[in-house]
A protein has these predicted regions:
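A ligand-binding cleft/hinge motif common to bilobed small-molecule-binding domains
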Residues: 88-91, 104-113, 160-163, 184, ...
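Ligand-binding clefts/hinges and TM-proximal coupling segments of bilobed small-molecule sensing domains
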Residues: 24-28, 156-171, 241-277
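Flexible hinge/capping segments at coil-to-helix
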Residues: 130-148
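Periplasmic-binding protein-like
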Residues: 122-130, 195, 199-241, 260-277
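Extracytoplasmic small-molecule ligand-binding "clamshell" domains
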Residues: 24-104, 112
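A structural signal for short loop-to-beta-strand junctions that line the ligand-binding cleft
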Residues: 31, 62-64, 111-122, 210-214, ...
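Extended ligand-binding regions for polar small-molecule ligands
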Residues: 62-74, 134, 140, 155, ...
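Short helix-initiation/N-cap motifs at beta->coil->alpha
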Residues: 80-91, 136-137, 171-185, 219
């Protein structure tokens, strides 16, 4: 009997210890966790030029990865990459698997689940990869019945151009690869997506001109973090984004990622919106 009571007591003690340990971990802020472990954990997901993994070495590269290295250096900790997907990044943050997911747009829906610094990480614009021979300065120049524009079905560019260009023929593809193939084959006159992705596709097909029609449709991206009372990491990320943006390092790592794919960066709009004239 005494032995049974002792076993019950020990079981309760272990359960209580586990409960309070988990509670303590839950209460530990991102900043505290980084300092205690000496690690900054960033989510990484395939998607150039933000992140890409070298199949030969297994090493990650891209603007998101390299800015992650800068953050870890300024924190005085080790950078740890945690592979995830764009769709699972929010859940990975909420469950404490990662400390931040860089290059995640601060949409209103995402803001309900996670936090974002006020300072944008960088900017991109809705661009157009247009075939040679078509002069375009403004979006209105594309609002013609004789112009076929390829877009990815259901994407932001699709939704925006459906309203902005009612006269143009929008040709919708299930993914960008099919749109690029159609552009290369001459089945569409232009492709519209955000300009960093178009820069990579232009380098692949070796055709067309990449432009940002006016008025420029701009979108900021950021770094998602957990919602928490302790705002230390939030404020750190806010200050770092501002510093790296103004110093030119953000643009440097963007260009570096494009150069790895043979892109002539002198012909590509930057991710610094003040450069867009």
């Amino acid at each position: 009997m005494k032995r049974s009571l002792h076993q019950v007591f020990m079981a309760i003690t272990l359960i209580s210890a586990s409960f309070f340990s988990q509670a303590a971990e839950t209460q530990t802020s991102t900043w505290q966790h980084i300092k205690q472990t000496g690690e900054l954990r960033i989510g990484v997901a395939q998607g150039e030029p933000w992140y890409f993994k070298n199949p030969s070495t297994g090493e990650w590269d891209g603007i998101g990865y390299n800015i992650g290295k800068e953050l870890a250096k300024d924190l005085g900790v080790k950078l740890v990459t945690v592979e995830t997907t764009w769709g699972n990044a929010i859940a990975a943050l909420q469950t404490g698997q990662i400390d931040t997911m860089l290059v995640l747009d601060p949409t209103e829906e995402r803001k309900k689940a996670v936090d974002f610094p006020e300072q944008p990480f960088f900017w991109y614009a809705q661009g157009v990869l247009i075939r040679d021979g078509i002069a375009v300065t403004n979006w209105d120049d594309l609002n013609r019945e004789d112009v076929k524009i390829g877009v990815t079905l259901g994407s932001s560019p699709d939704l925006i151009l459906t309203k902005r260009l009612p006269k143009a023929q929008l040709v919708r593809f299930p993914n960008m690869d099919e749109g690029v193939a159609a552009f290369y084959a001459g089945r569409v006159d232009a492709l519209s997506y955000f300009h960093p992705a178009l820069a990579l596709q232009q380098a692949k097909v070796g055709k067309g001109n990449l432009i940002l029609p006016k008025p420029i449709i701009e979108v900021s991206t950021s770094g998602a973090i957990r919602k928490e009372t302790d705002q230390t990491f939030h404020n750190f990320l806010n200050d770092e984004f501002a510093k790296l943006y103004k110093s030119g390092k953000t643009q440097h790592y963007y260009e570096q990622a494009l150069k790895l794919r043979g892109v002539d960066v002198s012909k590509v709009p930057s991710v610094i919106k003040e450069d867009w004239k």
